[in-house]
């Protein structure tokens, strides 16, 4: 199974890349993790936030293809680590690849949220883009450690 983290944004600082790499390299071989960066649309020439979101949504959906689509959104469902592990177990059993989407500065377009198979909230807080990437990478690793009975996660 492939986990694809699709992230709208610019090149991240070294600490973000280093932390994400640390968690993704710990993943088992059968869990391939790929980070796909989508260039953010510029708010030039009178483009409003919705037009920017819509253009980004099209590129995100192209990158996701037919994957199970998870959109990270502050209004999404909050879950515990064990609930996330159950979700991930279901993804693995389905045989589909999974794309997890982090929106740009203006967030995700409503059309993408409606197409998502699951809206997931890491937190109700607004967080820096890089921090979300790191938290997402860590939570995916933690969920897999629960599935594989690895001692990384403790209840």
Swiss-Prot record:
Q: Name one GO molecular function term.
A: rRNA (pseudouridine-N3-)-methyltransferase activity
Q: Which CDD domains match?
A: RlmH-like
Q: Where are the transmembrane segments?
A: none
Q: Give the InterPro entries listed for this entry.
A: Alpha/beta_knot_MTases (IPR029028), RlmH-like (IPR003742), tRNA_m1G_MTases_N (IPR029026)
Which keywords describe this protein according to UniProt? Answer: Cytoplasm, Methyltransferase, rRNA processing, S-adenosyl-L-methionine, Transferase
Q: Which principal EC class is assigned to this enzyme?
A: transferase
EC numbers on record: 2.1.1.177
| Amino-acid positions noted as binding S-adenosyl-L-methionine in the UniProt annotation, renumbered to this chain | 72, 103, 122-127
Query: Listed disulfide bonds for this chain?
Result: none
Record flagged with keyword Aminoacyl-tRNA synthetase: no
Q: Which reaction does it catalyse?
A: pseudouridine(1915) in 23S rRNA + S-adenosyl-L-methionine = N(3)-methylpseudouridine(1915) in 23S rRNA + S-adenosyl-L-homocysteine + H(+)
Primary residence: cytoplasm
Subcellular location per the Swiss-Prot or TrEMBL entry: Cytoplasm
GO CC list: cytoplasm
Q: What protein family does this chain belong to? A: Belongs to the RNA methyltransferase RlmH family.
What NCBIfam families does this protein map onto?
A: PRK00103.1-4, tRNA_RlmH_YbeA
Task performed by this protein:
Specifically methylates the pseudouridine at position 1915 (m3Psi1915) in 23S rRNA.
How does the record describe its quaternary structure?
Answer: Homodimer.
Q: Which HAMAP family match?
A: 23SrRNA_methyltr_H
Name of the molecule in the record:
Ribosomal RNA large subunit methyltransferase H
What is the species listed in this Swiss-Prot or TrEMBL entry? Methylobacillus flagellatus (strain ATCC 51484 / DSM 6875 / VKM B-1610 / KT)
Higher taxonomy? Bacteria, Pseudomonadati, Pseudomonadota, Betaproteobacteria, Nitrosomonadales
